[in-house]
């Protein structure tokens, strides 16, 4: 019964993500842990806004084997890696939003640091806007096992929290339930949009643009 409720919650989250436009053109993938050895993940090439329960495939987390023989998402290995690394993770959401895609390219370092935003508290455990939330950025790679190795190497030295970005690709985020994963996704997307807007304003504020009219309120019109 719990599994059915969680899958229902994940389907609702997928439809909501589709409405947001965060997984265009069948992009992205979503998964749900069943137990320590298995998860459900979206089948390759499915529109996330119109998914049904039968569009989720059973996968063995130890080796990415799909008993049904159907084709899961190409990035299944990143989902199963997260389930192996962190037993508390119950759901993983991977989206391709414009904000995540652009920010991951604009930020040249290996992490996006979010600080000063009240909405950081949408992320579990965050208590103050003064703290820094670090979202790692990994260079994109079509070889998913290689990309998974880089993520695992990072996690060996510093625990992953909330999510990570793949440069020019999108966001992976998770939670200890579908509800928490969805909240983390919504919170991070809001923070990404704020950060992108802030950077755009910073760039524009450095451009010397002279107004075409005199806007001094103390000057009388002639």
Swiss-Prot record:
Pathway: Amino-acid biosynthesis; L-methionine biosynthesis via salvage pathway; L-methionine from S-methyl-5-thio-alpha-D-ribose 1-phosphate: step 2/6. The gene is mtnB. Its cofactor is Zn(2+). Binds 1 zinc ion per subunit. The keyword Ribosomal protein does not apply. GO terms for cellular component: cytoplasm. The lineage of its organism: Bacteria, Pseudomonadati, Pseudomonadota, Gammaproteobacteria, Enterobacterales. Catalyzes the dehydration of methylthioribulose-1-phosphate (MTRu-1-P) into 2,3-diketo-5-methylthiopentyl-1-phosphate (DK-MTP-1-P). Zn(2+) binds at residues 94, 96. SUPFAM superfamilies: AraD/HMP-PK domain-like. It comes from the Bacteria. This is Methylthioribulose-1-phosphate dehydratase. It holds the Pfam family Aldolase_II. Disulfide bonds: none annotated.
């Amino acid at each position: 019964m719990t599994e059915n409720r969680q899958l229902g919650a994940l389907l609702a989250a997928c439809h909501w993500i589709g409405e947001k436009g965060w997984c265009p053109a069948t992009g992205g993938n979503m998964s749900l842990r069943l137990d320590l050895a298995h998860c459900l993940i979206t089948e390759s090439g499915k529109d996330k806004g119109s998914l049904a329960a039968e569009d989720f495939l059973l996968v063995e987390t130890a080796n990415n084997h799909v008993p049904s023989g159907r084709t899961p998402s190409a990035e299944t290995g990143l989902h199963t890696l997260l389930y192996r690394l962190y037993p508390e993770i119950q759901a993983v959401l991977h989206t391709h939003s414009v904000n995540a895609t652009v920010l991951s390219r604009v930020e040249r370092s290996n992490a996006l640091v979010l600080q000063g935003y009240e909405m950081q508290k949408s992320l579990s455990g965050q208590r103050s806007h003064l703290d820094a939330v670090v979202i790692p950025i990994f260079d994109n790679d079509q070889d998913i096992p290689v990309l998974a190795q880089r993520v695992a190497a990072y996690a060996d030295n510093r625990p992953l929290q909330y999510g990570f970005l793949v440069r020019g690709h999108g966001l992976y985020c998770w939670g200890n339930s579908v509800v928490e994963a969805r909240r983390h996704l919504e919170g991070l997307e809001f923070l990404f949009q704020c950060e992108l807007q802030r950077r755009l304003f910073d760039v524009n504020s450095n451009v010397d643009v002279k107004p075409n009219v005199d806007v001094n309120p103390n000057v009388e019109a002639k």
